[in-house]
Amino acid sequence: MTRPKYVASCSGGKDSVATLLLAAQHNEPLDEAVFSEVMFDKDTSGEVPEHRDFIYDRLKPFCEKALGIKFTILHADKIYDEVFHHVITRGPHKGEVRGFAWAGMCAVNRDCKIPPVRKYNAALSPDTVSYVGIAQDEPKRLARLDGLKKVSLLAKYGMTEADAYKLCQEHGLLSPIYTHCRRNGCWFCPNASDLELLHMVTKHPDMFDRLIEWENEDNIFHRRMTRRETPSEVKARLLSKSQTGFSSARNK
C-alpha cells in the first residue's frame, strides 16, 4: 500500500518555512511545497519585491536541491489589473470601474490568491495530507484543523511564532520582509501597515506610483487604497513624516 502524498502550503513567511525545516529535521514525509503568487499585472508580481526574490532565488532552490522536494508556484487566471479594472454591471455604480480592493473584504484574495489553490487541491487524491504553518501559540487557528488531513508540524513539535522566526533565521531562510513588517502580503494590500506602505513608497517608488496612476484614471468607483486614503494621500502623508516617527517592525 502506497502512502498518501504530503504537501506543505508555503507563503514564504516564517511559519510555513519553519514547517519545511521541521519536516526535514524530524524526517516527516514531504513531497511538495506549494506557493500561490498573486500577479499585479502580466509582468509584475504582487509580492513585495524582496519577498518575491526570496521565494524564487532562495526558497525554491533550497526545497528542490537541499530538501529534494518539488516547489510548485501557482497563478490564478485573473491578475490584479483585471480585478481593479473590472466594470461594475449592476447597482447604482453600474458602468463604473471597480477600483481598489476594500480592506476587510479583499477581492484580490478571492479572485487571485485562492482560486489556483482550490483548483490544485481539487486535483489531489482524497488521502493527501496538507501541512499548514500554524504555530503552537495560535490556539484558535489550530482548533480548526482536523489533525489528520490538515496538520501543523509547528504545533506537533511545540514551536511558537517566535520559535519559527528563530529557526528560519538560524538557517538563513528568513524572508527579508521581516525587516519592515510582521507578515507577508501583496505590496498593494489595503490592510498594509504604514511601515509596509512606507517601504514601497521609499524603496520601490515606481511601483507605488503605478497605483497613483490608476487612482487618477477616469470613472473609478473606489479610489481609496486603504480605509481612508487614496495612494497619493498615503504617499504624501508618509513622506511628510520623519522616518524616525516609525517604530521598527518587531519580530514575533
Regions found by a protein language model. Name each.
Residues 1-252:
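Nucleotide-activated chemistry modules centered on ATP-dependent adenylation/adenylyltransferase
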